[in-house]
């Protein structure tokens, strides 16, 4: 499972980790994670995260996350730049399993394959949700670094690497040094 780009991951977090966020809103991204890659992501405003996140190396990280409903908000529909509509249900369709603390793989960077102009933070929660949760809130931690951000020549290579990232994250999160931080969210 080791690739040339993978970094050595210790058995428990080492500085600057763990980095834990407050609850932040889940916003609509480009819609590529689900539609093009089959790997849905939750997007969050990077400006709402601890300042240290902007200083992190670009690449792939792992940790834990917790989603919660955003109360007292009206549902709404927004339009993506490509014209597709996004329904903000604020997490009202989440079930108890969706609201548990869940493993997450995080991408911090520019997504060179898609030539993004702005740095983003995207979370792939390792869980099958039955519906979207745009407008809900999410709290998460960065516990370790898997690999640097890469540019891909094919979508298939990108998808394969994301699946490997997920397997590495699941394996590392089972180690006691990482597993115990599940309870901090």
From Swiss-Prot:
Taxonomic superkingdom: Eukaryota
GO molecular function: ATP binding; metal ion binding; riboflavin kinase activity
UniProt key word Signal: no
Binding positions for Mg(2+) per the UniProt entry: 41, 43
Pfam families, per database record: Flavokinase
Gene3D superfamilies: Riboflavin kinase-like
InterPro entries: Riboflavin_kinase (IPR023468), Riboflavin_kinase_bac/euk (IPR015865), Riboflavin_kinase_dom_sf (IPR023465)
Keywords assigned by UniProt, alphabetized: ATP-binding, Flavoprotein, FMN, Kinase, Magnesium, Metal-binding, Nucleotide-binding, Transferase, Zinc
Example GO BP: FMN biosynthetic process
Top EC class for this record: transferase
Cofactor(s) essential for the protein: Zn(2+); Mg(2+)
Catalytic activity: riboflavin + ATP = FMN + ADP + H(+)
Pathways involved: Cofactor biosynthesis; FMN biosynthesis; FMN from riboflavin (ATP route): step 1/1
Active site: 122 (nucleophile)
Family statement: Belongs to the flavokinase family.
Function: Catalyzes the phosphorylation of riboflavin (vitamin B2) to form flavin mononucleotide (FMN) coenzyme.
Name under which the protein is recorded: Riboflavin kinase
Organism in which the protein naturally occurs: Kluyveromyces lactis (strain ATCC 8585 / CBS 2359 / DSM 70799 / NBRC 1267 / NRRL Y-1140 / WM37) (Yeast)
Source lineage: Eukaryota, Fungi, Dikarya, Ascomycota, Saccharomycotina
């Amino acid at each position: 499972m080791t690739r040339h780009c993978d970094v050595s991951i210790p058995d428990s977090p080492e500085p600057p980790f763990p980095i834990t966020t407050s609850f932040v809103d889940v916003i609509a991204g480009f819609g590529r994670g689900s539609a093009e890659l089959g790997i849905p992501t939750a997007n969050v405003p990077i400006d709402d995260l601890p300042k240290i996140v902007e200083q992190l190396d670009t690449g792939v990280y792992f940790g834990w996350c917790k989603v919660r409903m955003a109360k007292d908000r009206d549902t709404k529909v927004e339009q993506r730049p490509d014209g597709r509509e996004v329904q903000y249900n604020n997490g009202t369709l989440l079930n108890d399993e969706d609201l548990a603390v869940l493993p997450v793989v995080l991408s911090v960077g520019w997504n060179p394959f898609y030539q993004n102009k702005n740095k983003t933070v995207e979370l792939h929660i390792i869980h099958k949700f039955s519906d979207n949760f745009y407008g809900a809130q999410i709290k998460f931690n960065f516990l370790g670094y898997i690999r640097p951000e890469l540019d891909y020549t094919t979508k298939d290579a990108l998808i394969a690497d994301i699946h490997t990232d997920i397997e590495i994250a699941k394996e590392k999160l089972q180690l006691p040094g990482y597993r115990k931080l599940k309870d901090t969210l």
